[in-house]
């Protein structure tokens, strides 16, 4: 096996530090200095190229990719096949001049082979341990199958449910988004990147991608810096502080300059202010798309991106085809190219690829570590913890395992549709909801199934998702379902979105359930039988009619490989739901963007005053607020107690406490949430902001005092000069079960 010839000193360093050679950056620097001293300009530029094949106009055809690697013109590529990775790595190591190994990247967003709930659902667990565990398992499986680099976590703050990629993020709150971002980075990268079960993480999409205008993917973004720093940047910064190895630029504009070519964003902020020391990769063809933004031809935008601090070009082939010419013309410098090349080589070094290029390419390890029963059991547990109980007015849930249970709906007998966006799908160990219900009740109850309706009969939506429109069939299906459920004691109606209605390029202007599904729901209500409405979806939906009609509503999201079994664990009470929403559910799409931590208005809503901030046809408040979620038991909150009403100085500490009691008949978990409001500051501040929470478990009748420690760090924000400070004054402290239903008290904090 051909490897790069290491210097004697570098070899000693690698041996001395065993699995942690990067502990001594001098050894890494020495190694890379010597390697780059041997590299030609073409080979250096080649390290900056992430492509799936040959180079247009130079190498093409079936042998294009192989020859590109032999010439040293490829630094990374994508894919998901272990055998292919092995073949390509052997070409890179054995047949290229210097034997530099490749990186293999893949969108491992919420699992590799064992698929966990979509990230939006994961965030509703309010459990960073489980979230980190899901990323750890994803890294174990991906690394066992040749993947060295995941394009995750996506940490974009999203306040617009029309945007399909809201499914890939952690909701609307910057503080909680930051905690999740750090947990995902830890899960992927572990505590030592040289271990064979770790992979490079990639923070994305930097920056502001979740603020696309009108919720339309790839659309423009226009935002003040003060809003960026206070409301959108915290999760990105948290991922950097957690040590994310790479960053992906976003498609959108940032201050009228594409993020991919924005030096203030990629260098001044990311590197100089935040201290990021990894490499930055473009999103798919986002260098080329700068031409569509109006910034010039491929050569011009490629030079602009490199100068901005964009190290690797994904799929544009702009760097590999134009940077050499740009260097000759003085558009880029040799230092720019060398710096980008060094950053890519450092990532490979930190992974241990120069020591063993095949460390991720072990078929036996792939077989042993992939899609195991242990991983599936964990996925089932996490799926159950991610479910949010939206309504249970008449105690219909949990269901009894007796009588006749009808499972109805266009998603009731599906598996693939429950996995969610961005995932490889293997249904071998998965179940449909019908199958999972049958497994749960065994011979204790009879289970019947009816499809009931089409997913949609709306022409554009059906065409976009490969469905046919047939209103006549829908009417027939509804009638058949009504006939089939006539002997049922209870009905489980599984409605929502298939997996290809959310994710990239899946924006929806109407986020209600399609009329075809509502036709079935109306017919089921007319039977007079108890109906549990189960929602499988990748975004918040508008559910005002459903909320007014159904006694029990369960938000199951797209739950991954174990979606159905995790769901029935909740439906039948094996798991008491404890999930809480991390994104606001609007009453109408016309309220969007709608989020809990909004700014004040000069004319707060007053229903008796016409000239105040409100709608004529709907209330301002959401249907379900941020932090909302019910349990099969009930909890009561005592008054909020502060240990003092006045606090002094930087070192001051305030303790806020509340007594929480389980007033129901079942043991359950409650997410006790702390919010702080700053009613008078140098700039207008949000009405309240999440600052902490505790997830507690209480037995029936048990009571516990829950306390939060508050310091000036919890009061800080970016002021008009973008200084991260806290200001003295009066503060509102809130503790409660969600962002709307809280206990409150006030404290004065003096300098």
Feature-to-residue mapping (PLM):
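Bacterial Sec-dependent N-terminal signal peptides
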Residues: 1-23
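Glycoside hydrolase catalytic-domain context in secreted enzymes
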Residues: 16-719, 725-741, 748-751
């Amino acid at each position: 096996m051909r490897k790069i010839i290491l210097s004697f000193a570098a070899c000693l360093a690698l041996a001395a530090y065993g699995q942690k050679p990067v502990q001594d950056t001098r050894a890494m620097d020495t190694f890379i200095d010597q390697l780059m001293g041997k590299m030609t300009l073409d080979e250096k530029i080649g390290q900056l190229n992430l492509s799936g094949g040959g180079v247009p106009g130079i190498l093409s055809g079936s042998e294009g990719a192989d020859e590109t690697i032999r010439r040293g013109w490829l630094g990374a590529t994508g894919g998901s096949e272990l055998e292919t990775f092995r073949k390509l790595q052997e070409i890179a190591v054995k047949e290229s001049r210097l034997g530099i190994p490749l990186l293999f990247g893949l969108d491992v967003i919420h699992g590799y082979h064992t698929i966990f709930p979509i990230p939006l659902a994961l965030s509703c667990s309010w459990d960073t341990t489980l979230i980190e565990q899901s990323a750890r398992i994803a890294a174990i499986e991906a690394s066992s199958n040749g993947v060295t680099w995941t394009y995750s976590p996506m940490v974009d703050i999203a306040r617009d449910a029309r945007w399909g990629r809201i499914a890939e993020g952690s909701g609307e709150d910057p503080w909680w988004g930051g905690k999740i971002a750090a947990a995902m980075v830890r899960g992927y990268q572990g505590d030592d990147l040289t271990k064979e079960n770790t992979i490079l993480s990639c923070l994305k999409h930097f920056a502001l991608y979740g603020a696309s205008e009108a919720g339309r993917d790839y659309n423009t973004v226009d935002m003040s810096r003060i809003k960026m720093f206070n409301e959108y940047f915290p999760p990105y910064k948290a991922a950097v502080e957690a040590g994310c190895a790479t960053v992906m630029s976003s498609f959108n504009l940032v201050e009228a300059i594409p993020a991919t070519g924005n030096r203030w964003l990629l260098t001044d902020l990311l590197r100089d202010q935040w201290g990021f020391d990894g490499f930055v990769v473009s999103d798919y063809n986002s260098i080329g798309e700068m031409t569509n933004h109006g910034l010039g031809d491929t050569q011009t935008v490629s030079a602009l991106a490199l100068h901005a601090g964009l190290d690797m070009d994904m799929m544009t082939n702009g760097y590999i085809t134009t940077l050499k010419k740009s260097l000759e013309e003085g558009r880029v410098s040799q230092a720019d190219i060398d710096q980008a090349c060094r950053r890519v080589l450092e990532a490979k070094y930190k992974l241990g690829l120069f020591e063993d290029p095949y460390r991720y390419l072990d078929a036996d390890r792939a077989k042993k570590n992939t899609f195991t029963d242990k991983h599936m059991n964990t996925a089932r547990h996490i799926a159950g913890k991610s479910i949010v109980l939206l309504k249970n007015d008449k105690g219909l849930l949990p269901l009894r395992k007796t009588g006749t249970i009808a499972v109805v709906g266009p998603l009731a007998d599906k598996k693939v549709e429950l996995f969610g966006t961005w995932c490889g799908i293997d249904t071998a160990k998965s179940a449909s909801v019908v199958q999972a219900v049958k497994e749960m009740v065994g011979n204790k109850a009879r289970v019947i199934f009816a499809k009931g309706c089409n997913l949609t009969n709306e022409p554009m939506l059906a065409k976009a998702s490969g469905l046919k429109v047939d209103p006549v069939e829908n009417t027939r299906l509804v009638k058949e379902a009504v006939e089939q459920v006539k002997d049922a004691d209870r009905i489980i109606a599984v409605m929502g979105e298939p997996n290809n209605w959310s994710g990239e390029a899946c924006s929806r202007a109407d986020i209600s359930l399609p009329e075809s599904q509502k036709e079935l729901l109306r017919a089921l209500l007319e039977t007079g039988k108890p109906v549990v409405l189960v929602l499988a979806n990748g975004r918040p939906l508008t559910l005002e009619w459903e909320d007014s009609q159904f006694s029990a509503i369960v938000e199951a999201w797209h739950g991954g490989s174990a979606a159905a079994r995790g769901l029935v664990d909740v439906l039948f009470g094996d798991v008491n739901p404890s999930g809480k929403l991390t994104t606001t559910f609007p009453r109408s799409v016309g309220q969007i963007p709608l989020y809990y931590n909004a700014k004040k208005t000069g004319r707060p809503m007053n229903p008796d005053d016409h000239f105040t901030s409100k709608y004529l046809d709907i209330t301002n408040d959401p249907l379900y607020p941020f932090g909302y979620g019910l349990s099969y038991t009930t909890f009561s909150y005592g008054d909020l107690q502060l240990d003092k009403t006045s606090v002094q100085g930087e070192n001051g500490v305030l303790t806020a406490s509340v007594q929480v009691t389980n007033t129901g008949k079942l043991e359950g978990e409650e997410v006790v949430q702390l919010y702080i409001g700053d009613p008078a500051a140098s700039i207008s501040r949000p009405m309240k902001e999440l600052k902490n929470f505790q997830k507690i478990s209480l037995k029936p009748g048990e009571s516990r005092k829950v306390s939060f420690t508050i310091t000036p760090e919890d009061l800080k924000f970016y002021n008009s000069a973008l200084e991260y400070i806290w200001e003295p004054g009066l503060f509102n402290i809130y503790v409660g079960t969600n962002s709307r239903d809280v206990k409150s008290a006030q404290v004065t904090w003096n300098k």
